[in-house]
């Protein structure tokens, strides 16, 4: 017999086996589980921290085996087959959605051909270093584009609340298979870190090639190849090698679009082919707020010393719109995530140790389609696709941020000065590289966004006393939390509603947010492709 139980410990009791066993036995009695002298074997499943009160508690969950031995491994089996030549599937994008789609295809021996505009991890790391130290941006290989997608060099956070979308444990298990620490299988908020994730992505890509798949780096998808009989159908893609300039046509049985939230050219490509395949969706924009780590730790841990950096999650409703923290990076860094030279875009990341001197989070507010100014709707309509209005507006805000910056030095303002609407004569030390420049965010950010952020920060300070302080720094602008465009797909077949054999997938298509949910969507879409090919 087996059952699952939860116990509560103090941090000092976490490694006290006698205390743990006593609490487990007590929980079994409380749940009226009959053990009758049988051997009890607990297997640890998950840990989370409850820091809501002054006395911090650890919530530990166990699977308890009563009178039987634990299973050797109750994780999913990974059965990959070498690709056959019978079927081929093109995957545009090598982020988590694309990679996990590829591994799902290997379960049926189907060959994936991955098209990736950016560099493999080692060269991509060089591109990123040049951006941070010299301010030089490679528009196709950066924090957003390249091997492993945006998450490879921007945090490696795996936590998702979208567990109903797929088997998240299988997602974690595959990461562990390629070198991720096993604790991601049990942590409540699993995190790999940008110092470890590139090696894991390398191992994944090596396996894809070993199994007979292909990965084409530095290769841009420039167009779909379509044919029309009864309906429009995608049969391949046109590509361009960004190093040699060579153009090529690649044909396949199906195409999975897993391009991420920053591939504006893909939306514009689809708008030319079939504008009704796109729809506008709600997204969010705002700023990064960065504190010295010790301030957040003191607030969240009530002055107690803990080995890890503290996290937080904040939400508010202001003027009928949500304002919330996103991608909180304890012990992390703020990083530049623009994909064009005339943009400033920021994001956050942490290494596996989460041990920098700062903690940061995006603070963003909803931007619904009806919030987009009419001039952008008119521009998108004139260009044949009204659904792109939010994308045009987002680009405008990123350009506006650049115009209030100094090259890749991001505009910044102390949080207290933002609330008081005054100049920041000095700025606190920051993790952001290349650097920051003092700017009146309160003057040039769109008024509705500024007002909502100001009101939300005051509300957040009620929940986290000391959140508003002179050392807190706002860095603009955070605009890539999600895409403003959705590529429409059928709820059952997951095929694009307007273009047959085209399968929108992941964050860039509007169906996920973050590594975990994107990987699950990749598996889900690949399963739909497999079902289609079996018919």
How should these model regions be labeled?
Residues 1-58, 62-153, 157-174, 178-535:
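Residues forming the flavin
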């Amino acid at each position: 017999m087996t059952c699952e139980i939860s116990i509560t410990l103090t941090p000092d009791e976490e490694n006290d086996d006698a205390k743990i066993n006593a609490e487990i036995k007590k929980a079994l009695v409380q749940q009226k589980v009959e053990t009758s002298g049988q051997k009890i074997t607990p297997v640890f499943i998950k840990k989370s921290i409850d820091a809501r009160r002054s006395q911090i508690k650890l919530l530990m969950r166990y699977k308890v085996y009563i009178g039987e031995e634990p299973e050797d491994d109750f994780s999913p089996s990974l059965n990959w087959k070498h690709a056959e030549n019978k079927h081929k599937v093109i995957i545009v994008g090598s982020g988590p959605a694309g990679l996990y789609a590829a591994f799902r295809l290997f379960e049926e021996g189907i060959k994936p051909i991955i098209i990736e505009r950016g560099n493999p991890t080692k060269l991509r790391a060089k591109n990123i270093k040049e951006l941070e130290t010299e301010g030089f941006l490679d528009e196709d290989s950066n924090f957003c584009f390249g091997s492993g997608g945006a998450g490879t060099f921007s945090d490696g956070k795996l936590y998702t609340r979208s567990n109903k979308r797929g088997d998240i444990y299988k997602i974690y298990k595959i990461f562990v298979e390629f070198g991720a620490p096993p604790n991601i299988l049990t942590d409540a908020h699993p995190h790999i870190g940008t110092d470890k994730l590139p090696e894991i992505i390398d191992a994944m890509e090596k396996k894809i090639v070993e199994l007979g798949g292909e990965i084409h780096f530095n290769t841009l998808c420039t167009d779909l190849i379509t044919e029309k009989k009864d309906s429009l159908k995608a049969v391949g893609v046109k590509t361009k090698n960004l190093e040699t300039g060579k153009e090529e046509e690649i044909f396949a049985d199906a195409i999975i679009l897993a391009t991420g939230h920053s591939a504006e050219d893909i939306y514009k490509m689809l708008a030319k082919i079939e504008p009704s395949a796109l729809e506008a969706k709600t997204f969010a924009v705002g700023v990064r707020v960065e504190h010295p780590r010790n301030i957040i730790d003191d607030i969240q841990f009530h002055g107690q010393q803990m080995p890890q950096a503290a996290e937080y999650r904040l939400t508010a409703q202001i003027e009928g719109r949500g304002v919330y923290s996103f991608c909180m990076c304890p012990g992390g860094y703020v990083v530049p995530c623009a994909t064009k030279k005339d943009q400033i875009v920021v994001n956050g990341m942490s290494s596996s140790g989460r041990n920098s001197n700062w903690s940061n989070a995006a603070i963003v507010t909803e931007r619904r389609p009806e919030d987009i100014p009419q001039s952008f709707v008119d521009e998108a309509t004139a260009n044949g696709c009204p659904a792109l209005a939010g994308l045009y507006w987002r680009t405008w805000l990123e350009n506006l941020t650049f115009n209030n910056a100094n090259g890749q030095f991001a505009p910044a303002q102390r949080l207290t000065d933002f609330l008081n609407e005054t100049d920041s004569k000095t700025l606190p030390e920051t993790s952001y590289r290349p650097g920051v420049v003092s700017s009146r965010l309160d003057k040039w950010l769109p008024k509705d966004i500024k007002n909502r952020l100001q009101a939300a920060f005051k509300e957040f300070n009620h929940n986290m006393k000391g959140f508003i302080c002179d050392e807190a720094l706002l860095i603009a602008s955070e605009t890539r939390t999600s895409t403003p465009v959705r590529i429409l797909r059928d709820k059952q077949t997951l095929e694009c509603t307007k273009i047959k054999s085209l399968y929108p997938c992941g964050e860039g298509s509007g169906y996920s947010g973050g590594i975990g949910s994107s990987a699950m969507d990749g598996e889900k879409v690949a399963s739909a492709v497999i079902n289609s090919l079996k018919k």
